[in-house]
Structure formats: structure tokens, C-alpha cells
Amino acid sequence: GRVSVHREGFTRAMGLAGDGDRIVVASAHQLWRLENMLGPGEQANGAYDRLYVPRAAHVTGDCDVHELAIDRAGRIMFVNTRFSCLAVPSARYGFTPVWNPEFISKLAAEDRCHLNGLAMHEGVPRYVTAVGRADMVDGWRAHRMEGGLLIDVATQAVVADALSMPHSPRVLPDGSVLMLDSGHGELIRVDPVGGRRETVARLRGFGRGLALHNGFAILTLSLPRNGSFGGLHLEDMLIAAGTAPVCAVQIIDLR
């Protein structure tokens, strides 16, 4: 097999989830549902065993959706970064909030803590990441360097702190959490019981997405905005190594 890349345009696409026959994409103001149109044994253009076609879009408004998942009931659950909460689509409104960090006193379109990552376990939300413990408009920006949090959704407990711009937590089979400590330029594993963390890999770009497949971590790296990483530790690490940042998909063997 080989990697096949096909580009399709969605305005400010960030969140992505799927179950084989369905893909859900979060864009600037909508959640798009794409369905596979091929049956068993069918191929498109004699090469592809999936053909995803847009079938529905739900208007959320400007929620800055960073990540989403499909829960055990088949609902789309998404990280509503603008309103600092987890949410589901609403038939009447743009969304219905279902959870928020306990330090958020009001759900307002103010991106207070930059809630951005969601880990599901057995079809329910398990962990989230936030860039900083803040309860004011854009308050997270003062915590970019070392203020990041990994939070247990069920208990509101902080599992890990002193992270830098954390993203994309994922629960491993042993119960530990694999995630991107993006500002430090690392893929890390966190023990949710004791909080101990270990570096799995160092990254040559800003990590923004992570998936697990058959013992492999598949992650995406971004280049800096405006030519620099804004003083993050990642920038210092790359300079010290004499390495230029890359925009790439990286596959890491976890076995």
C-alpha cells in the first residue's frame, strides 16, 4: 500500500472524525457530514475503496471548533473553543453545551482558556486539553509557555500541567494518554494516575493533530505563523539542533 492524498477545500477545516463509512469535518461555521458511497468490493476510478460525498451540513456559527468525535450514541461531540466548552449540535441553536472546565464561570464567545483537544474512551469524553487556566477573554495567551493542562472530564481533576500549547490527547490501550505537547515540540505519554510523563518523540514542527492506528501514532506538523513560533520552547529546540521546521505527516511506531 501507499499514501494517497486528495485535496478538498473546506474553509478553516480543523476538527475531523470518522468511523469508516462516515467522515465529519469541522469548518469555520459548519459541521460537514460526508458519507461513503461505495459498497463492498466497489472501487472508484479503479483504485479507491472509499468515496466520501458531502451529505449534510450543520451551521454552528463561529465556534472555532478544534476537534470533534462521534460518541457511543452516534452524536457528534465537538470542542467549542470559542465558548470554552464541549458541545453537541442543536436542532434549534448552533450548539448545546454539555461540559466545561470548572474554572470557566460563563460560556461566552471569548476563547477564555483555549480548550482545544478531546480524548474519547469507550464512546464518552475522557480527557480534554486547554492552553491555560483562565477565565477572561483570550486569557490563555498569557499561559502559552507553561500553562497548559490535561483535564479529566469526569472528575475535573488536572491530570498534567506545565504543558505548552497541548493538543490532541488520545487514550492508549493501557489507559495512559498520548498527546502533543506542541509548544515544547514533543509527543508525550502521560500516566493519568500519577501524572508522570515521558517523551516519546521530538517534533520538527508544531503538532496539531494525532491519530492512533495498529500501534502507530500518526501526527501532523505545521510551520510557524509569521515566520516564528513566538518564543515557544519548540523554536529554541529547533535552533539549537540547527534544524528547520517542516509541514508534514509523521508516523511513529509505538510498539
Question: Where does each model-flagged region fall?
Answer:
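Residue position within the beta-strands of beta-propeller blades
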Residues: V25, F78, V128-T129, M179, ...
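A short loop-to-beta-strand structural motif that recurs across blades of beta-propeller domains
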Residues: Q30, C85-A87, E146-L149, E186-I188, ...
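Short, conserved, GDST-rich strand-edge loop motifs in beta-rich repeat architectures
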Residues: R33-E42, V128-M145, T220-T243
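Blade-loop segments of beta-propeller domains
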Residues: R2-E67
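Surface-exposed loop and turn segments in beta-propeller and other repeat-based domains
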Residues: G41-G61, G94-C113, G132, A157-V158
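Loop/turn-rich, solvent-exposed surfaces of beta-rich toroidal or solenoidal domains
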Residues: M165-G242, C247-Q250
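Beta-rich, blade/repeat-based domains predominating
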Residues: F10-G20, H58-R75, I104-R126, G147, ...
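Short loop/turn segments that connect beta-strands within beta-propeller blades
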Residues: M37, S90-Y93, V153-T155, D191-G195, ...
